[in-house]
């Protein structure tokens, strides 16, 4: 949460230059508090598992967050009970008229599928466009980053010949970036994808700010200059056993998957894995909620579309 200080205190200017948020008294007297509204577009097959992971991350904040769940594929799910979807999920038509402080679009197991072959691809594009006037800040995870780069910048997907799976080391590129507040200079995060996110290509084809990269996994964290689209190419929300579950699933399917790197002790899948990314995962979501959602959004959720003027990315 921000600290409140007198308007003319020298610290206000100094801390502001360091991107540390302070609230001046003149602003504080005009601020009221309301719950943040966050929409989660859940594209993962095991929706309940993903819900738990994301809500665990969102709950690690002093801010009250009200969550709506969204689905766009109305086909019967093989991994989530239909009753659960009917009881807890909205269709897009039910939320189209709403405004949200934040939105999260999850990954999806579609890394080797062309965008035009994805059944709900037109709806994905529509929701991304809709968010410009209805959402303060949108967080894209893994496959959703590919989708957003295509929808916003026309970037075609790049893929690895072999699935990138494991826990990779990253380095931060900006000491004062609020999204990385509290991060170590080097940190680890899980990845599970075929998608390739080459920093040189992203710099050449977008105006995104890149905040963290990995020599092995490529770009990890980036955002638009207005903070309204945030791109996370990994899975900081994953539980300790999620990568193991994916590995065992692929083994059972006869796919001969690679062993997730830096995950099992001694690289032995017979040994229980350990979570080494948990603290940075929580920090990332807390920082996003605080600096990119709470600090930027309007007090009246009805005013969100009026406050922001969308500009087409260059």
Swiss-Prot record:
Pathway field: Amino-acid biosynthesis; L-methionine biosynthesis via de novo pathway; O-succinyl-L-homoserine from L-homoserine: step 1/1
Q: Which GO terms describe its molecular function?
A: homoserine O-acetyltransferase activity; homoserine O-succinyltransferase activity
Keyword Glycoprotein annotated: no
Residues of the active site: 142 (acyl-thioester intermediate), 235 (proton acceptor), 237
What enzyme class is recorded for this protein? transferase
Q: What is any one of the record's Gene Ontology cellular component terms?
A: cytoplasm
In Gene Ontology terms, what is a biological process of this protein? L-methionine biosynthetic process from homoserine via O-succinyl-L-homoserine and cystathionine
One Pfam short name: HTS
InterPro entries according to UniProt: Class_I_gatase-like, HST_MetA, MetA_family
Catalyzed reactions per annotation: L-homoserine + succinyl-CoA = O-succinyl-L-homoserine + CoA
Q: Which SUPFAM superfamilies match?
A: Class I glutamine amidotransferase-like
Which residue positions hold the site described Important for substrate specificity?
192
Could you tell me the EC number(s) of this protein?
2.3.1.46
| Compartments, as annotated in UniProt | Cytoplasm
Q: What does this protein do?
A: Transfers a succinyl group from succinyl-CoA to L-homoserine, forming succinyl-L-homoserine.
Similarity section:
Belongs to the MetA family.
Protein name as it appears in the record: Homoserine O-succinyltransferase
The gene behind this protein is metAS
């Amino acid at each position: 949460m921000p600290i409140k200080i007198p308007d003319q205190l020298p610290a206000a200017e100094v801390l502001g230059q360091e991107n540390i948020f302070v609230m001046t008294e003149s602003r504080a007297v005009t601020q009221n508090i309301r719950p943040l509204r966050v929409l989660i577009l859940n594209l993962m097959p095991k929706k309940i598992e993903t819900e738990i992971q994301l809500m665990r991350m969102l709950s690690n904040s002093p801010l009250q967050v009200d969550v709506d769940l969204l689905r766009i594929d109305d086909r019967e799910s093989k991994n989530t009970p239909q009753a659960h979807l009917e009881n807890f999920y909205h269709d897009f038509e039910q939320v189209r008229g709403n405004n949200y402080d934040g939105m999260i679009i999850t990954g999806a197991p579609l890394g080797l599928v062309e965008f035009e072959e994805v059944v709900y691809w037109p709806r994905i594009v529509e929701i991304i466009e809709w968010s410009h006037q209805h959402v303060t800040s949108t967080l894209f995870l893994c496959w959703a980053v590919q989708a957003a780069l295509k929808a916003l910048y026309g970037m075609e997907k790049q893929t690895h010949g072999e699935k990138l799976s494991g826990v990779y080391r990253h380095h931060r590129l900006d000491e004062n970036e609020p999204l990385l507040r509290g991060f170590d200079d080097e940190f680890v995060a899980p990845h599970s994808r075929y998608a390739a996110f080459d920093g040189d290509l992203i710099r050449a084809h977008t105006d995104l700010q890149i905040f963290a990269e990995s020599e092995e996994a490529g770009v990890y964290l980036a955002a638009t200059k207005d903070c309204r689209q945030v791109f996370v190419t990994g899975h900081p929300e994953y539980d300790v056993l999620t990568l193991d579950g994916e590995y065992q699933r692929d083994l059972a399917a006869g796919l001969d998957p690679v062993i997730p790197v830096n995950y099992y002790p001694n690289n032995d899948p017979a040994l229980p894995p350990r979570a080494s990314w948990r603290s940075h995962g929580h920090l990332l979501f807390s920082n996003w909620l605080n600096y990119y959602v709470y600090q930027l959004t309007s007090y009246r959720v009805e005013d969100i579309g009026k406050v922001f003027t969308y500009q087409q990315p260059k």
